Amino acid sequence: MDTSPKNIAVIGSGVTGLGAAWALSRNHHVSLLERDTRLGGHARTIDVTMGEKLVPVDTGFIVFNHRNYPNLTNLFDTLDVATEATDMSFSVKSGRYEFAPTPGALLGDPRHITSRRTWAILRGINRFRKQVAGYETIPNPDDTLIDFLRGGHYPEPFITDYLLPLAAAVWSGAGTDAASMPVGTFLHFLSNHGLFEIERPRWRTVSGGSREYVERIAKEIPQVRTGVNVTAVARAPDGVEVTTPDGPEFYDEVVLATHAPQTLRLLGDDAREEERSILGAFRYAPNRAVVHRDASVMPRRKAAWSAWNAVGTPPGSAQPISVTYWMNRLQNLDPNHDVFITLNPGTDPEQIIDDIWYAHPQFNPDTDRAQQRLPEIQGRDGIWYCGAWTGYGFHEDGLQSGLTVAAALGSPAPWHDSITPATPAAIHSARSQTLAGA
């Protein structure tokens, strides 16, 4: 393989692009191009007033753990990024009903002892855990999750008041789309890495917010250009042409660290049939994230307040499941000044501090097949594809994807040979395991 330094453009500065550009910079001449005026993608930190202080609060990427995020852990260690322990408790409310799968929350409300709804949820949890353990033997793994649950006569409270809200917490608000996921995929990531292990992953958050790692990694990439609106990427006789409003630029290789639909738009008429088929399989759902101080979105009983708090909706509802993150608990903030982030609020909360939209990939049998076909187009004519969409949409998925491309171009991460990359399923089963209180 040719190991001489190449002129490479990385388009997109989320964790995927940052990781790819950082690793590639060790052996190549790299230009990181970002349309926005800031770097980081979902790694976005804002300053919130708490008393007399401005405190950093994350609005996108918030938590990770050492066991299931090996690349992210190694990156943080390499960059000397400080992290701290966090809490991953979970609650659901539906109307006046509130449920949190912890002894304190259940026993703290005597109504749960005689509630048919609560007992239906607990029976469903117990039965579903057994189903997860035997996921490899289910007869129709391509059935949707909701069809599997309804066909298996699972209690409706378990579906609407527990499992789908749990999925919404795991997938950043996209619980209604989780209902359409292949049940085999869903059960697999719940089972992988031991859903029923007593020793659960210990979750952590970046001290000072995720911008700490973004700023540190950016300093190690020699050429970073923000505010560059790339409008097209096309194959050229001697490389790849990148078009911006300032004119064309030419590179030996181009790494597209963008959402799949954005990638397809950049290729435009130059996209081949295989690229249209693979990249065109992915759809994204918009999720609104509102940072605020309105405690009315939380459970009525303070004892039920958790790090992650979901509001259930019936499957198929036009309204996405709403999830509220209690940032004081997640990021160890001053308990005297509550700050919340609500995804997809049904009505606007009071005391809004910040309002932003994120997009998350939606997964189904078509995307599963598209992911398996990615090697068909990877690296052909100097164009490379990466992003969290190549896994299950999480930070480790994105970083692993970018580092995989860098390694293929002869510039692996320094820890490349010392870890076994986490599968997407392992990442999500760990998060689900913790939220479920297994």
Residue locations for each model-derived region?
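Mid-domain catalytic core of redox enzymes
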Residues: T231-A232, A236-A359
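Helical element adjacent to the flavin cofactor pocket in flavoenzyme catalytic cores
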Residues: L187-T244, E249
